[in-house]
Amino acid sequence: MPTNQQLIRKARQRLESGTKSPALRGCPQRRGVCTRVYTTTPKKPNSALRKVARVRLTSKFEVTAYIPGIGHNLQEHSVVLVRGGRVKDLPGVRYHIVRGALDAVGVKDRKKGRSSALQSIVATRIIATIPYQLF
């Protein structure tokens, strides 16, 4: 315990809290290439096969990122956008893959979590990606 005189001479150092997503290097998202896509099991009280991918980012980090939603089209060499955000029951998974950006398509037939304005945008985007031979 320092004395008052010691504190006057040299003030207490502020504790700097480290970032929870160091691989993003202060950016909101980073682009990366999937090196491995696989499933893993969560921690003790939960039971499932969670879909995750090992991603090599443009910042030269290789991270494990969670693939949210039901079903995905990702495979090795897919280019994805990675954001921060951990998965509580998967140790070591501190990043999420952004659905609907780059090679990761949005969740098929998603009903919830869409405003009426966004529904029309998503519908036109889906129609725009369908080749003309199908019409």
UniProtKB/Swiss-Prot annotation:
Similarity comment: Belongs to the universal ribosomal protein uS12 family.
UniProt entry tagged with the keyword Chloroplast: yes
Residues making up the signal peptide according to the UniProt record: none
Subcellular location field: Plastid, Chloroplast
Function: With S4 and S5 plays an important role in translational accuracy. Located at the interface of the 30S and 50S subunits.
Pfam name, any one: Ribosom_S12_S23
Subunit annotation: Part of the 30S ribosomal subunit.
Record organism: Adiantum capillus-veneris
Gene Ontology CC: chloroplast; small ribosomal subunit
Disulfides per UniProt: none
Gene Ontology molecular function, alphabetical: rRNA binding; structural constituent of ribosome
Official protein name in the record: Small ribosomal subunit protein uS12c
Superkingdom of origin organism: Eukaryota
Entry keyword Ribosomal protein: yes
Keywords: Chloroplast, Plastid, Ribonucleoprotein, Ribosomal protein, RNA-binding, rRNA-binding
GO biological process: translation
Primary location class: plastid
